[in-house]
Regions:
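Conserved HGGG/HGGXW glycine-rich cap/lid loop of the alpha/beta-hydrolase fold
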Residues: 2-44
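The conserved beta1-alpha1 loop
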Residues: 7-11, 74, 210
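Active-site loop/oxyanion-hole signature of alpha/beta-hydrolase fold enzymes
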Residues: 33-72, 111-114, 252
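Conserved hydrolase catalytic core segment
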Residues: 68-110
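Flexible "cap/lid" loop of the alpha/beta hydrolase fold
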Residues: 95-135
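Conserved alpha/beta-hydrolase catalytic His-Asp/Glu region
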Residues: 130-186
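Conserved loop-alpha-helix segment in the C-terminal half of the alpha/beta-hydrolase fold
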Residues: 198-238
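Catalytic histidine-centered segment of alpha/beta-hydrolase-like enzymes
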Residues: 238-248
Length: 263
């Protein structure tokens, strides 16, 4: 009997192979597939609300599979699976969002106002992303550089090595980030502000796994999701980036949650 399929969608700035250690704990139970790098196909540019990125994921699923899949996505990737599942529920057995909060009506309104006023960059990671260092002389140098960064301090060491290995590519100048910082910044700037309109429209089994210390989830107000969307909720100790901090524990929770959704 063939394994059930997980199609994984990565977070902004972290190509899929950064999650190799997480995948290794899932592969006994599931076939794990992914698009290696979202948002870099000129056919699907970054637009406000991530609509073309949604289309990119939907086309990938329709082209690749002849049976329903389990959509697992971290942050950006989770929101994209949510958007596709609302539009094309027949593609999915279930979706599992990893710290990918569906922001509340109040938060959405704030995002829309800030975008209209041209002030959203002041409150998003976009500016620091655009000016991030993007040139090293070796992958060891990439690893050592990010190892010193607060954002990466809690990463599992193997995960960080995978990020250095697969998140940097050799060019004529040296090693540069595989996920272009300019595109990462555009994605932050294009954060959807219309997600509340989808309440009541999700028709597939769904779960949300969150980090206990996730600032992103706190700002998004999970109370909206609890009240208006049919998600099961579970939490794992860690930040917004907990799948990269605790890959084994994350895999165990994904397996447990999917079994519950399948009852």
């Amino acid at each position: 009997m063939s394994k059930q399929i997980i199609h994984f969608a990565h977070a902004n700035g972290f190509p899929a192979k950064t999650y190799n250690k997480l995948f290794s704990y899932l592969e006994d139970d599931f076939e794990v597939n992914y698009l290696e790098r979202h948002a870099h196909n000129p056919k699907f540019p970054v637009t406000d609300g991530w609509e073309r990125l949604r289309d990119e994921l939907r086309e990938e699923l329709e082209k690749r599979y002849t049976r329903k899949i389990i959509g697992v996505g971290h942050s950006l990737g989770g929101i994209l699976h949510f958007l596709v599942a609302v539009e094309k529920p027949d593609l999915y057995q279930a979706i599992i969002l990893l710290d990918a909060p569906i922001i509340s009506r109040l938060s959405s309104g704030g995002v829309k106002i800030l975008k209209t006023l041209g002030l959203f960059d002041r409150f998003s990671p976009s500016p620091m992303t655009r000016f991030r260092r993007n040139l090293w002389q070796s992958k060891d140098e990439v690893f050592e550089h990010f190892k010193q960064k607060e954002k990466f301090a809690a990463f599992d060491e193997d995960v960080l090595r995978d990020y250095a290995e697969h998140g940097a590519i050799e060019t004529e100048r040296g090693y540069e980030l595989f996920f272009k910082p300019s595109i990462e910044a555009k994605i932050y700037r294009a954060l959807p502000h219309n997600l509340p309109k989808f309440r009541g429209k999700l028709k597939v089994p769904a779960a949300y796994i969150g980090g206990t210390n996730s600032q992103e989830a706190r700002m998004a107000r999970l109370s909206f999701m609890r009240k208006h969307l049919p998600f099961e909720f579970q939490f794992l100790e860690g930040s917004h980036l907990f799948p990269l901090e605790k890959p084994q524990e994350t895999a165990e929770v994904i397996i447990t949650v999917f079994r519950r959704l399948s009852r």
